């Protein structure tokens, strides 16, 4: 049986789409994950095609051992949310996935400036680990929900283990899964190592 989403979507989440949408798609992702990068334009297109029928939620699941820049990228997106609200988060989210090959701290600060936010404030937040607890909370909620790789998707609080690589199939599967709970073998994820640590503790 598929593991359900243990932490319900709430006011702390980053949400795009209407609250009364019939389908809620939750992604546990990693900004440095190759597969998440491949999924990004597909998810964007699915959201566009489904319009008001879908609500999209992004949660952090940085695989620190495999992706050394992922944690700071996640923290930078949280800092952007703190400065610019929901719009700030999604603008940074898009910048990070559009520039996966350049995620050093200097790059992160440049993206912050490009979306019109205070890069100095984000630099200070990264140095102090201000938003590390927020990222860690997402990570832990993913572990409790059976997440062991990225990207991992949940459709209406049930894990979706089908293929997301084909946009048409993914769109159809999201709607089918919402109605019938149909499942397929998992395809295309970066897997968390057995001994992978959680994101770093507070500084």
Name every feature range the model reports, one short phrase each.
Residues 19-21, 52, 149:
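Residue-level preference for short coil/turn positions at secondary-structure junctions
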Residues 26, 31-113, 184-200:
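Structural alpha/beta surface segment adjacent to cysteine/selenocysteine redox centers
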Residues 6-23:
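A short beta-strand-turn-helix
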Residues 28-29, 40-45, 110-203:
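C-terminal cap of thioredoxin/glutaredoxin-like
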Residues 15-16, 103, 160:
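Short clusters of hydrophobic/aromatic residues that line enzyme substrate/ligand-binding pockets
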Residues 1-4:
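N-proximal helix/coil linker or "cap" segments that precede and/or mark the start of modular domains
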Residues 16-18, 26, 49, 146:
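Generic structural signal for beta-strand residues in well-ordered domains
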